[in-house]
Design a protein with these regions (language model features):
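Short, acidic/small-residue loops that bind anionic groups at enzyme active sites
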Residues: 152-180
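Conserved small/polar residues in nucleotide/adenosyl-binding loops
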Residues: 183-184
Length: 184
């Protein structure tokens, strides 16, 4: 049987949702694994129209791994529902908003958004670890998170590796880096 991969959505103000949609719109993804997004269904839903060719993708909101369908065209999202889309701001929006908002109001709104997104990204990683430790998923894959945002949310880690080490009670760990090549 193909492995179930718990894929974290990443920072809701980043490109993780769009990257996930792009990966899951390819039928060959389902030929090698059973992908499951750990994140917010409404963020994933909002990402679909931003990805060319993904218009027919559907979201299957789940709260347990057994509810997943693992079918091409359907994105199974283990929904943690921690993001308020009305408060989510992107870095690229800051310039535009600066024209219509006072600086102190914009700064407060931006800080609130980044803290919320940091908390969300942290919760997605934590849930993916819990699912793996419980044997509900076979492996985890992480989308990018913003370390500043998770720190703003009160979780003081320098990245994914340290979160994994902490929540798996691993004393000795390291990160391996290698050159990455992209194909589009």
């Amino acid at each position: 049987m193909k492995p179930i991969l718990g894929i974290t959505m990443g920072d809701p103000s980043g490109n993780g949702p769009e990257i996930s949609v792009k990966a899951l719109m390819k039928p060959e993804t389902y030929e090698v694994c059973r992908p499951l997004i750990v994140g917010d269904a409404k963020c994933m839903e909002a990402a679909i129209p931003t990805v060319k060719g993904a218009e027919s993708m559907k979201i299957n909101v789940i709260h347990g791994v057994k509810e997943a369908k693992f079918e091409p065209g359907i994105i199974d999202v283990y929904d943690l529902d921690v993001v308020d889309l009305s408060k989510r701001l992107y870095k690229k929006d800051r310039k535009k908003l600066a024209e219509i908002m006072q600086a102190d109001v914009l700064d407060a709104a931006y800080k609130e958004s980044m803290t919320m997104c940091g908390e969300a990204a942290f919760q997605y990683v934590k849930k993916a670890i819990e699912l793996a430790m419980a044997g509900e998923v076979d492996a985890t894959v992480t989308n990018a998170l913003n370390k500043d945002h998770i720190n703003m949310a009160g979780h003081h880690y320098s990245g994914h590796t340290e979160i994994y080490a902490d929540y798996t009670h691993t004393a000795k760990y390291s990160m391996m880096l290698a050159p990455v090549s992209y194909t589009h």
